[in-house]
From Swiss-Prot:
One Gene Ontology term from the biological process aspect of the record: pyrimidine nucleotide metabolic process
EC number: 2.4.2.3
Name of encoding gene: Upp1
Protein's organism: Mus musculus
GO cellular component terms listed in the entry, alphabetical order: cytosol; nucleoplasm
Post-translational modification: The N-terminus is blocked.
NCBIfam families xref list: euk_UDPppase (TIGR01719)
Protein's UniProt name: Uridine phosphorylase 1
UniProt note: phenotype after gene disruption: Homozygous knockout mice are completely viable and show no changes in growth, development, sexual maturation, and fertility. There are no significant histological alterations present in the major organs including brain, lung, heart, liver, spleen, gut, and kidney. However, uridine concentration increases by more than 6-fold in the plasma and in tissues and 24-fold in urine. Moreover, pyrimidine nucleotide metabolism is more generally disturbed. An effect on thymidine metabolism is not reproducibly observed.
One Pfam assignment: PNP_UDP_1
Length: 311
């Protein structure tokens, strides 16, 4: 019997769905997959029931910040009500925190490439086991700017390494493996439009340099170790700026690499807390920093509302 118009459309939409692509044939043969750092397992949790409706995943370093974000986005989407709580789904561990409101998942990733890398392995597998499709994942965070007014929001065009190359290098079984750091260009433009819609703060699109360290790795002069001069630092940061780098953080390269490899549409949106050409230490008043940190949340919250037709 021929399909009805509605059935045919549903079938077409199903064929157009973009599912998670694990680049690991071993997973399919496993009877149980323990996501140790989330305190979740395929044998003890029903992932499709828990996460099957997720369409937007937002990740950030701080667990408290991601808890604040889920409350904010829930209110924006009309999912909140007085007294509503958003329990930590990973409450059995203190490594990461995870919160959910409707189609939005909010997950903390800690600080630096190793921490976010571990989280992403388990998050991507979790979404795969939940049979999620058409996922958009966005890192929202803080960074140091280069030549930007503090409080500016940078939407990452390309994640680059300390030599300004769009590469992520990892040692695997004693060998160097280099992968690209591609992000979704269309998603960048959608976020740019959302920033224009809001028109609340300075925004730029630029490259984001991802480093392994907060101090020497970012050319700071105020760490316990420093083997270079102020002149050396300025020369390096100006070279980075000339290469299109507008901010510096410690997670974007592995985030871009892993999301791209697994078929996830991904973006990075970070606020700058200072201009590194002007100094190294963050001495902005606390209340100002809190407002700065809300800027990526407001931008991404508006993007989610707009994507769901609720803006």
């Amino acid at each position: 019997m021929a399909a009805t118009g509605t059935e045919a459309k549903d079938l077409e939409n199903h064929h157009n769905d973009c599912f998670i692509q694990l680049s690991n044939p071993n997973i399919a043969a496993m009877k149980e997959d323990v996501l140790y750092h989330f305190n979740l397992s395929t044998s003890t949790h029903d992932f499709p029931a828990m996460f099957g409706d997720v369409k937007f995943v937002c990740v950030g370093g701080s667990s408290s910040r991601m808890n604040t974000f889920i409350k904010y986005v829930a209110a924006e989407l009309g999912l909140d009500h007085p007294g509503k709580e958003y329990p930590n789904i990973c409450a059995g561990t203190d490594r990461y925190a995870m919160y959910k409101a409707g189609p939005v998942l909010s997950v903390s990733h800690g600080m630096g490439i190793p921490s976010i890398g571990i989280m992403l392995h388990e998050l991507i597998k979790m979404l795969y086991h939940a049979r999620c499709s058409n996922i958009t994942i966005i890192r929202i965070g803080t960074s140091g700017g280069i030549g930007l007014e503090p409080g500016s929001v940078v939407i990452t065009q390309q994640a680059v390494n300390e030599c300004f190359k769009p590469e992520f290098e990892q040692i695997v079984l004693g060998k160097r493996v280099i992968r690209n750091t591609n992000l979704d260009a269309q998603l960048v433009q959608e976020l740019v439009q959302c920033s224009s819609d809001l028109n609340e703060f300075p925004m730029v699109v630029g490259n984001t340099m991802c480093t392994l360290d907060f101090y020497e790795g970012q050319g700071r002069l105020d760490g316990a170790l420093c083997s270079y001069t102020e002149k050396d630092k300025q020369s390096y940061l100006r070279a980075a700026h000339a290469a299109g780098v507008r901010n510096i953080e410690m997670e974007s390269s592995v985030f871009a690499t892993m999301c791209s490899a697994c078929g996830l549409k991904a973006a990075v949106v970070c606020v700058t807390l200072l201009d590194r050409l002007q100094g190294d230490q963050i001495n902005t008043p606390h209340d100002v920093l809190v407002e700065y940190q809300q800027r990526p949340q407001r931008l991404v919250g508006h993007f989610i509302k707009k994507s769901l037709g609720r803006a």
